[in-house]
Amino acid sequence: MTRYKAIISYDGSGFYGYQVQPNTRTVQAEIEKALTKMHKGKTVRVTASGRTDTGVHAKGQVIHFDSELDITAEKFQKALQVMTPFDISFLTVEEVPDDFHARFGTVGKEYRYVVKRTKIFDPFSRNFALHYPYELDISKMKLASKRLIGEHDFTSFCSARTERDSKVRTLYSIDFYEEDDETLVIAFQGNGFLYNMVRILTGTLLDAGQGRISPDDISEALLARDRQKLISKTAPPQGLYLWRVDYE
């Protein structure tokens, strides 16, 4: 039995998230369907670095699976690329040690959120970015983001549905890239993220850019450890990308 690590990208628009769910189309289900077919009906389970929600995309999701087939990683990559739908891409496949674990071995992740700042709605980007036709002061967003850097209890910045007991996470950096006059990308790097955390942080920073909240409001929300204390809305899923997963 050999363990394989794969880096995949996918367009989340047509999936009900990554994780297998009954009677719905998910990324995991499509990959496991292809692997099971390759293994002549024997079920093959796939483990990912983490789940993504309905409509969320991935540029660098990492998965692992075990196989007893005597084929090279390169052939696995080619076969899976052919046997999975066009909205999933296998960027790399490689053999890894048996103790590699896509989920428990992570030491950091990067998420990016794409904001389209056009006055007129662009129907061709509706599934891949948030349309935000309002004025934004990027300098205010950067000031606000500094209050979030470091180790904090992010209870106020995650969904009440978060299953983790500890809400303490470390944010290494938040960077802002103005790719052109219309596109703002916010990049979040940290040792881990809670359910809806990046989308809530994005909504908070957008409010800061409009002057609705101040850096002090963010500090107070962190100390309050109560999602109800924060007025910012959760940004919608379509602008969010799992960009990269890091391992030791």
UniProtKB/Swiss-Prot annotation:
Could you name the domain of life of the organism this protein comes from?
Answer: Bacteria
Protein name stated in the entry: tRNA pseudouridine synthase A
Q: What are the GO MF terms of this UniProt record?
A: pseudouridine synthase activity; RNA binding; tRNA pseudouridine(38-40) synthase activity
NCBIfam families given in the database record:
hisT_truA
**Which residues are the active-site ones?**
D53 (nucleophile)
Quote the catalytic activity from the record: uridine(38/39/40) in tRNA = pseudouridine(38/39/40) in tRNA
SUPFAM superfamilies linked to this entry = Pseudouridine synthase (SSF55120)
Annotated Gene3D superfamilies: Pseudouridine synthase I, catalytic domain, C-terminal subdomain, Pseudouridine synthase I, catalytic domain, N-terminal subdomain
Which sites bind substrate? Y111
Quote the PANTHER family the UniProt record gives: PSEUDOURIDYLATE SYNTHASE, TRNA PSEUDOURIDINE SYNTHASE-LIKE 1
Function of the molecule: Formation of pseudouridine at positions 38, 39 and 40 in the anticodon stem and loop of transfer RNAs.
- Give the family, as the similarity comment puts it: Belongs to the tRNA pseudouridine synthase TruA family.
Broad class of enzyme this protein falls into? isomerase
EC no. given is 5.4.99.12
Q: Which GO terms describe its biological process?
A: tRNA pseudouridine synthesis
Q: How does it assemble?
A: Homodimer.
Write out the entry's keywords from A to Z: Isomerase, tRNA processing
